Every structure is written in structure tokens, then in C-alpha cells.
């Protein structure tokens, strides 16, 4: 089975490639991006290439690209959450500052949520944001997540403690909100 590609009306979510490193660096050297999500500003193209190899190359991580361009504008993906003991997916995302306010992230997240619930058979998906990241909170609310709890967490890359708010969305809650398919899976 090949890599999963998700398509929406405006976006193609595809696997990251090492040749995306210069573009990733251009997006992630911005101090408004990484620290808001809990990671450091990228300092070089080589560092971005290593992030692609070690973090973004997972099977459930996608580069967000516009339909008319191969260049990534951000990223969306799933990891195992720390919100609960049993393994459940947690949705994460970011987008470059030049693409803020265009609803690309909610659109990408909706495609990943549909994939989670209809193709992977997940029962619940988590999402979280640091308390001072209001943009992320708005994305989470647009996608229908419900608040669950807030806790203090140590953010290792930034060497600081932050308050993190956790949200969850069950497959039943998601079904109430969605009746049509907004993406296609390519393999």
C-alpha cells in the first residue's frame, strides 16, 4: 500500500519529502510559528531536512499544499496523545504566517478527521493548544472539538512550563456534524 494522500476542494495533503526542506525552513524560521506549537525556530535548511526525516516522515503526517502548487504551506498530522493512558490519536497542525486567516488549517483538519473516523476506525481524536495560542483554539472549535481539561506541561524544546488545553471529538459527535465526504484517499 502506498502513501495516503488526502484531497479537499482547495488542498492536497501529501507526505513530506526531503526536497521540501528549503520550503520548510522558509516557513519555520518565523518566530511566530514553532514556539506557539512548542518547538524551536528552525535555524538552517539542514535542520529542517532532519525534522522531515525524524518527525514529519511518519505515515500519519502530511504536508499541506495548495491544489495549484506543490509547495507546502503547513503541516497536519496525528500522533499518540498524552491526554489519556490508552493509545488514541491527537491531531496537530501549523501553517505559515502568510497563509493565516484563509481557513486552510480547518479544511486540512476536517479531511484528516474524516480519514481517522471512516478509514482508520478511530473512536475518539484529541487536540490540544497552549493557553496563549488563540489561533489554534479557534481551529479546534471550528472542527467541533469539545473542551476536556487543562493542565501544566513541561515543553522540553523550549525549556519552559505552559498551560495546555485538551479537547476531544468522538466519532458520534463528528457524524452529527458531517454528512458529505470532503476528500478522497489516493494510494
Regions found by a protein language model. Give the residues of each.
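Acyl-donor (CoA/ACP) binding surface of acyl/acetyltransferases
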Residues: 1-36, 61-187
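Conserved GNAT-fold acetyl-CoA-binding loop/helix
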Residues: 32-53
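A short helix-loop-beta-strand connector motif used in the catalytic cores of GNAT acetyltransferases and
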Residues: 52-63
Amino acid at each position: 500500500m502506498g502513501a495516503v494522500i488526502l484531497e479537499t476542494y482547495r488542498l492536497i495533503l501529501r507526505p513530506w519529502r526531503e526536497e521540501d526542506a528549503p520550503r520548510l525552513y522558509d516557513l519555520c524560521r518565523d518566530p511566530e510559528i514553532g514556539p506557539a506549537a512548542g518547538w524551536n525556530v528552525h535555524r538552517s535548511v539542514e535542520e529542517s531536512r532532519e525534522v522531515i526525516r525524524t518527525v514529519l516522515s511518519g505515515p500519519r503526517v502530511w504536508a499541506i499544499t495548495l491544489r495549484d502548487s506543490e509547495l507546502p504551506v503547513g503541516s497536519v498530522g496525528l500522533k499518540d496523545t498524552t491526554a489519556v493512558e490508552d493509545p488514541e490519536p491527537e491531531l496537530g497542525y501549523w501553517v505559515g504566517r502568510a497563509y493565516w486567516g484563509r481557513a486552510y488549517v480547518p479544511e486540512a483538519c476536517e479531511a484528516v478527521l474524516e480519514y481517522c473516523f471512516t478509514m482508520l476506525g478511530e473512536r475518539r481524536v484529541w487536540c490540544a493548544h497552549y493557553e496563549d495560542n488563540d489561533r489554534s483554539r479557534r481551529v479546534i472549535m471550528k472542527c467541533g472539538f469539545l473542551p476536556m481539561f487543562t493542565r501544566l506541561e513541561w515543553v522540553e524544546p523550549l525549556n519552559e512550563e505552559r498551560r495546555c488545553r485538551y479537547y476531544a471529538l468522538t466519532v458520534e459527535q463528528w457524524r452529527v456534524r458531517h454528512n458529505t465526504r470532503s476528500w478522497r484517499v489516493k494510494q
